[in-house]
Amino acid sequence: QRLTLTQPAAAALYAGIIGDTGRFLYDLTTAQTHRAAADLLATGIDAPAIGRQEDQFPENVGRLIGWALENVHITTNGAGSLIITQSVLQQFGLQYGEEQRAVGNIGKLASIDRWVVFTERQDGKYRVELRGKTKEINTLAVRHGGGGHPLASGAVADDEAEVQAIEKELASD
């Protein structure tokens, strides 16, 4: 017995697919992913409108992205690192968690093949978000008590010393 898929449900699923696959760019995107998206498109959803909606962000987030691209440190071997402090979040009128859009945008720089974004939490620890275009970074996350997917992982750094250790390890990989 088949379930009926409503357009709102199809639209939500399609938004999830394009988000999770980076608009079908990520390595784990398969033919099955494309078939599922095609089935959702067949329901009559407005894919361009969904794509535009998923691609938009508030002006203050855009300004943070510009700041992030200007301030990311890039090593000669393609490792990028950025620290977003509580004062930076305040400067852009953002709450903790609203800086997420900056993480993926750093990877759009051609000179970077792996990167880390540290976001200072209220308790002084740092959320660690590791990303790689082709180099797996999840083992680095595991070494620091985190985990995740081969090209997208995370952890928590207890202090600035651990932040520096992660930066050094990422640059040496």
Per-region residue spans from a language model:
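Hydrophobic helix-and-loop "lid/oligomerization" segment in the mid-to-C-terminal part
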Residues: Y14, G19-D173
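A short, charged helix-loop
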Residues: Q1-G16
